[in-house]
């Protein structure tokens, strides 16, 4: 039997984080959650910040547990959300906690940037990244306009996973996948775009050296070794952007696949050799984010389970206020009720602006259906059926666009993330898109993180061996398309309702 090798993954999301111990032996992997913790926004002075020092402390706490158990880990890897960053001064010290992408300081800044610096069309032509007001390009510009003191004193600018790796090793890098979310990176050159960097009043050297996933950043500093009880463990640049790590974990057999990272927010896309930047991708606001081994993740953001989660929270709050039994609000009960309802009574566009953050999601759905002349949902089951069917129809629209963009056939749709556990939505997606769906893994981000560490250690040759190991370690659930005529008719209704 092959000796088991251990790897330590740090997986940070916008609301919570985890440290995970991954092991690899005999062509299979295993995961063990070491710690789980909240990632809280700090609100002060009308701004929202991330507590980078608290996150560092949580990583140290996870590493201490590993040391206490006497486990030898080969390496450490960190993935996080994109866009946000930390300023470091010339002495190597972090300049205050980083602003969070949810902070309102970027509202209205995009249009000012286009008017005063570089046009919208040219920015997309250079980066191929969808326009979001919180992209790093606009965050830094907003801070420059405001005379931000930390920016003015910054010697280095590090994206969040790179900042945490820096705190562990003392080495500053710029990992490719997370840098691609900034809207400053040019995928054609594989580096930050000089014109965009200069438009912010910065120099290229203020960002770290561009580093590809599965590269060694350095080893734990002596200080961190003393804090944790570990030796000089290597820290690896994995795919620092969590979605890139998740897509690396798609257990595909060849390149002819699409993926759907399904959670509160969903991302549907394809893996390509080159960025797709043209008039149609610009018009439809598709994005080209960095993948591993030189690939591009060509994708589009979708609302995901956000609407369902918000409705369920409202119902729970109402039940609590009225001292009602909450059994009917269990996830399984709600899905069972949804399946009892007539099909396609009510259809919404999940990405309509009215569902972005309404005071009442239930009321927003009612008003949308009333406005479009449809049956207005009344019961929990009717609401859930409406949400799941509408999501599947929106997935179909984007899958149809992806088929037009791809220069290869899309024979399968891989669904990864927490949403892959919703078997009814998986079947609806297969039916709606007319394609075989393979669901799993649920823990895609952590798995991708660990597999890239294994690649850096020399245990894995390339992405396809990585994906084969993942496929060998999991039992994927398969969903074949059914009810074509009914879904075709519903899709026509969706397009009319959507407008």
Give the label of every model feature segment.
Residues 135-141:
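A charged, well-structured terminal subsegment
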Residues 45-48, 120-130, 206:
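Short glycine/proline- and acidic residue-enriched helix-loop micro-motifs
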Residues 64, 68-101, 130-134, 161, ...:
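Short beta-strand-loop/turn "lid" adjacent to the catalytic site in phosphate-handling enzymes
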Residues 79-84, 213-214, 262-265, 412-420:
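Glycine-rich beta-strand-to-loop/alpha-helix junction loops that act as flexible
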Residues 99, 103-116, 451:
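Short alpha-helix plus adjacent loop in nuclease-associated cores
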Residues 1-96, 108, 125, 225-235, ...:
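N-terminal glycine/serine-rich phosphate-binding loop of ATP-dependent small-molecule kinases
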Residues 72-80, 156, 209, 407-417:
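Short glycine-rich phosphate-binding loop at a beta-alpha junction
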Residues 2, 9, 21, 114-127, ...:
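Active-site core segments that coordinate phosphate-bearing ligands/cofactors
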């Amino acid at each position: 039997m092959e000796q088991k090798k251990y790897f330590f993954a740090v997986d940070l999301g916008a609301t919570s984080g985890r440290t995970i111990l991954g092991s690899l032996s005999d062509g299979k992997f295993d995961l063990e959650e070491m710690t789980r913790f909240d990632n809280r926004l700090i609100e002060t002075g009308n701004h929202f910040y991330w507590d980078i020092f608290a996150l560092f402390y949580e990583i140290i706490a996870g590493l201490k547990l590993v040391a206490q158990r006497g486990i030898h880990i080969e390496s450490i890897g960190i993935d996080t959300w994109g866009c946000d960053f930390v300023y470091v001064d010339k002495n190597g010290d972090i300049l205050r906690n980083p602003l969070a992408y949810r902070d309102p300081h970027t509202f209205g800044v995009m249009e000012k940037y286009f008017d005063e610096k570089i046009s919208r069309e040219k920015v997309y032509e250079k980066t191929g990244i969808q326009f979001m007001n919180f992209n790093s390009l606009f965050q830094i510009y907003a801070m420059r306009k405001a005379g931000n003191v930390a920016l003015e004193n910054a010697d280095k600018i590090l994206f969040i996973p790179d900042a945490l790796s820096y705190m562990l090793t003392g080495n500053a890098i710029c990992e490719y996948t997370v840098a691609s979310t900034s809207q400053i990176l040019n995928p054609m050159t594989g580096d930050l775009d000089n014109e965009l960097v200069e438009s912010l009043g910065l120099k290229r050297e203020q960002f770290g050296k561009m580093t590809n996933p599965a590269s060694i950043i350095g080893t734990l500093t002596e200080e961190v070794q003393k804090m944790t009880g570990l030796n000089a463990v290597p820290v690896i640049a994995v795919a620092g952007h969590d979605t890139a790590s998740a897509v690396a974990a798609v257990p595909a057999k060849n390149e002819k696949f699409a993926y759907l990272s399904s959670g509160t927010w969903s991302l549907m896309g394809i893996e390509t050799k080159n960025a797709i930047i043209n008039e149609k991708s610009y018009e439809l606001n598709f994005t080209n984010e960095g993948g591993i081994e030189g690939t591009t993740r060509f994708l589009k953001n979708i609302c995901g389970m956000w609407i369902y989660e918000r409705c369920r929270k409202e119902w729970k709050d109402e039940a609590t206020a009225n001292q009602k039994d909450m059994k009917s609000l269990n996830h399984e009960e709600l899905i069972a009720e949804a399946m009892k309802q007539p099909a396609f009574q009510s259809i919404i566009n999940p990405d309509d602006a009215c569902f972005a953050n309404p005071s009442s999601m239930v009321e927003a759905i009612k008003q949308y259906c009333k406005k479009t002349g449809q049956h207005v949902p009344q019961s929990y089951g009717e609401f859930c059926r409406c949400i799941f069917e509408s999501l599947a129809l929106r997935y179909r629209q984007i899958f149809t666009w992806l088929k037009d963009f791809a220069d290869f056939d899309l024979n399968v749709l891989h669904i990864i993330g927490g949403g892959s556990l919703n078997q009814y939505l998986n079947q609806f997606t297969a039916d709606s898109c007319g394609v075989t769906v393979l669901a799993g893994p649920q823990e895609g981000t952590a798995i991708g993180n660990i597999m890239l560490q294994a690649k850096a250690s020399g245990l894995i040759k390339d992405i396809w061996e990585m994906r084969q190991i993942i496929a060998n370690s999991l039992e994927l659930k398969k969903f074949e398309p059914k009810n074509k005529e009914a879904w075709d008719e519903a899709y026509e209704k969706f397009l009319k309702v959507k407008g």
